[in-house]
Amino acid sequence: MNISNSQVNRLRHFVRAGLRSLFRPEPQTAVEWADANYYLPKESAYQEGRWETLPFQRAIMNAMGSDYIREVNVVKSARVGYSKMLLGVYAYFIEHKQRNTLIWLPTDGDAENFMKTHVEPTIRDIPSLLALAPWYGKKHRDNTLTMKRFTNGRGFWCLGGKAAKNYREKSVDVAGYDELAAFDDDIEQEGSPTFLGDKRIEGSVWPKSIRGSTPKVRGTCQIERAASESPHFMRFHVACPHCGEEQYLKFGDKETPFGLKWTPDDPSSVFYLCEHNACVIRQQELDFTDARYICEKTGIWTRDGILWFSSSGEEIEPPDSVTFHIWTAYSPFTTWVQIVKDWMKTKGDTGKRKTFVNTTLGETWEAKIGERPDAEVMAERKEHYSAPVPDRVAYLTAGIDSQLDRYEMRVWGWGPGEESWLIDRQIIMGRHDDEQTLLRVDEAINKTYTRRNGAEMSISRICWDTGGIDPTIVYERSKKHGLFRVIPIKGASVYGKPVASMPRKRNKNGVYLTEIGTDTAKEQIYNRFTLTPEGDEPLPGAVHFPNNPDIFDLTEAQQLTAEEQVEKWVDGRKKILWDSKKRRNEALDCFVYALAALRISISRWQLDLSALLASLQEEDGAATNKKTLADYARALSGEDE
């Protein structure tokens, strides 16, 4: 029988294809596979190159890849490589173990970005994965923004976590959640994300659920809840290089006799004080090679996530569910000096302190519920201003609160370190939709204020509340005064949300409608009320009030302190909310909006208050100053864009 070469080649191809399904590579752990195959792409890594598992990552990755551990929770800070670990383990599951995998991120946008900047470059840069993706770089039904289907028959899905439909229909072996704390508590009233998502793995022979996140607020944080449901909470213990005693690294504080310590105002002096024998440990002295994770509840431990031991040292079966905690102090991607610098920047700013606790320490933030500031005490904190605009003020912003029968505006001046001065109070009575009322608001917006040297300053940016009235009124005024100068806003009472989240694009009405994190702003403002400057010395974050009853009086102080934090049950969960108890709070709202205007200037136009003030102080002559200040106002309000 004659067989052509082409027929032989086709036969060889089909035989190989048939035998390929029978081939099983030599078993590898997740770490072994990642160290041999994983590559960090330039699009999503600080440093492109071959992956090398760090000591504190070893047990976490092997636990993620283990068939014997069903649930893995990772409570972590930033800069510990969690997303990279997760993606490396997913590649291991797809190529080595041939499992169907699914990962959820908080929103559809997050999922699309993760697929574009992390997943697709990873497929490109790992040869064994690329060999399973003949569709790479092409339009193909197996290559979409939500799904990749490989030639070994395995699928990978990457979906947003907001919609309940994204938790249906898929049947997978591995379910993962990145930044779980940012997910909604209740997905369209159908349940928690992990409850819905883990239903997708119930039919698997080797079900796996991986949850990881930087934590948020204590009592309402989903990664905290997931961790509390696990019987094992593991912390990374390292031996003291001097006395040999094991301990996990703690940040500590002034009262604790161990942890990170440094000379005041000198971050470079930082060292770690051993909790056992008060040994002084420098960062470069620690050796994590033989460090191990120890459960603070049961005492079980592991070095590599494969072999597990009881507190007495006897080998035991791997746990069904386990939680790991890891934070920045262990990371080679930062220094203890930088950690201390970051801590020092949080002084006087609760929002920054919360961010530090969450993203540097990897701990939940415990919101403090306290009494309101005393309005009568605050009303006595009046100061004599040397001019309508005090010398240390570099920039003016305003907040406008909308009511049906009036508009209220407060003008605030800002100096280095966000030190602030109340400059003006304007209450414009009249129907909110009457043009004559709005013309008087226009006059208030365009009012100028004088410095001691005679230079006049205009309000650089204004945030105008759209709540409670027809928002198109504010939209039209934004277009009239400049889209970047007058910014329509809406409040978002979500704990931890940034003070201002200005969109990059205009909405369908042609304006930059901006969400304001009112809870975050109020907490920062209340914390700043506690700062008391000494004499005329600068104090970052301090708040100043003028000895002028037209601008500041007891009524103003009462409105600034009208709200308090209370615990309320919302949808079956306890939450901490700001409540005015029906007290008037327009002054506080205006302060929030003025702070938001400042933050927009800093984040969008890189406003540097220190540099701007230095430039203003160098100017001589009123005429020169007027011209220069007008230029500053135009540039910093975005009119030159």
From Swiss-Prot:
<keyword id="KW-0231">Viral genome packaging</keyword>
<dbReference type="InterPro" id="IPR046454">
    <property type="entry name" value="GpA_endonuclease"/>
</dbReference>
<dbReference type="Pfam" id="PF20454">
    <property type="entry name" value="GpA_nuclease"/>
</dbReference>
<feature type="region of interest" description="Prohead binding">
    <location>
        <begin position="610"/>
        <end position="641"/>
    </location>
</feature>
<dbReference type="GO" id="GO:0009036">
    <property type="term" value="F:type II site-specific deoxyribonuclease activity"/>
</dbReference>
<feature type="region of interest" description="Endonuclease">
    <location>
        <begin position="401"/>
        <end position="586"/>
    </location>
</feature>
<dbReference type="GO" id="GO:0098009">
    <property type="term" value="C:viral terminase, large subunit"/>
</dbReference>
<dbReference type="InterPro" id="IPR051220">
    <property type="entry name" value="TFA_Chaperone"/>
</dbReference>
<dbReference type="Pfam" id="PF05876">
    <property type="entry name" value="GpA_ATPase"/>
</dbReference>
<feature type="active site" description="For ATPase activity">
    <location>
        <position position="179"/>
    </location>
</feature>
<feature type="short sequence motif" description="Walker B motif">
    <location>
        <begin position="174"/>
        <end position="179"/>
    </location>
</feature>
<keyword id="KW-0460">Magnesium</keyword>
<feature type="region of interest" description="Interaction with the terminase small subunit">
    <location>
        <begin position="1"/>
        <end position="48"/>
    </location>
</feature>
<dbReference type="GO" id="GO:0046872">
    <property type="term" value="F:metal ion binding"/>
</dbReference>
<keyword id="KW-0540">Nuclease</keyword>
<keyword id="KW-0479">Metal-binding</keyword>
<keyword id="KW-0067">ATP-binding</keyword>
<feature type="binding site">
    <location>
        <begin position="491"/>
        <end position="498"/>
    </location>
    <ligand>
        <name>ATP</name>
    </ligand>
</feature>
<keyword id="KW-1035">Host cytoplasm</keyword>
<feature type="region of interest" description="Leucine zipper">
    <location>
        <begin position="588"/>
        <end position="616"/>
    </location>
</feature>
<feature type="binding site">
    <location>
        <position position="401"/>
    </location>
    <ligand>
        <name>Mg(2+)</name>
    </ligand>
</feature>
<feature type="short sequence motif" description="Q motif">
    <location>
        <begin position="42"/>
        <end position="51"/>
    </location>
</feature>
<keyword id="KW-1188">Viral release from host cell</keyword>
<keyword id="KW-0378">Hydrolase</keyword>
<comment type="similarity">
    <text>Belongs to the lambdavirus large terminase family.</text>
</comment>
<dbReference type="GO" id="GO:0003678">
    <property type="term" value="F:DNA helicase activity"/>
</dbReference>
<dbReference type="GO" id="GO:0004519">
    <property type="term" value="F:endonuclease activity"/>
</dbReference>
<feature type="short sequence motif" description="Walker A motif">
    <location>
        <begin position="76"/>
        <end position="83"/>
    </location>
</feature>
<keyword id="KW-0255">Endonuclease</keyword>
<comment type="function">
    <text>The terminase large subunit acts as an ATP driven molecular motor necessary for viral DNA translocation into empty capsids and as an endonuclease that cuts the viral genome from the concetamer to initiate and to end the packaging reaction. The terminase lies at a unique vertex of the procapsid and is composed of two subunits, a small terminase subunit involved in viral DNA recognition (binding to packaging sequence cos), and a large terminase subunit possessing endonucleolytic and ATPase activities (DNA maturation and packaging).</text>
</comment>
<dbReference type="GO" id="GO:0030430">
    <property type="term" value="C:host cell cytoplasm"/>
</dbReference>
<dbReference type="GO" id="GO:0005524">
    <property type="term" value="F:ATP binding"/>
</dbReference>
<dbReference type="GO" id="GO:0016887">
    <property type="term" value="F:ATP hydrolysis activity"/>
</dbReference>
<feature type="region of interest" description="Basic">
    <location>
        <begin position="573"/>
        <end position="584"/>
    </location>
</feature>
<dbReference type="InterPro" id="IPR008866">
    <property type="entry name" value="Phage_lambda_GpA-like"/>
</dbReference>
<feature type="site" description="ATP-binding">
    <location>
        <position position="46"/>
    </location>
</feature>
<dbReference type="InterPro" id="IPR027417">
    <property type="entry name" value="P-loop_NTPase"/>
</dbReference>
<feature type="region of interest" description="DNA packaging/ATPase">
    <location>
        <begin position="166"/>
        <end position="349"/>
    </location>
</feature>
<dbReference type="GO" id="GO:0019073">
    <property type="term" value="P:viral DNA genome packaging"/>
</dbReference>
<keyword id="KW-0547">Nucleotide-binding</keyword>
<feature type="region of interest" description="DNA packaging/ATPase">
    <location>
        <begin position="166"/>
        <end position="353"/>
    </location>
</feature>
<protein>
    <recommendedName>
        <fullName>Terminase, large subunit</fullName>
        <ecNumber>3.1.21.4</ecNumber>
        <ecNumber>3.6.4.-</ecNumber>
    </recommendedName>
</protein>
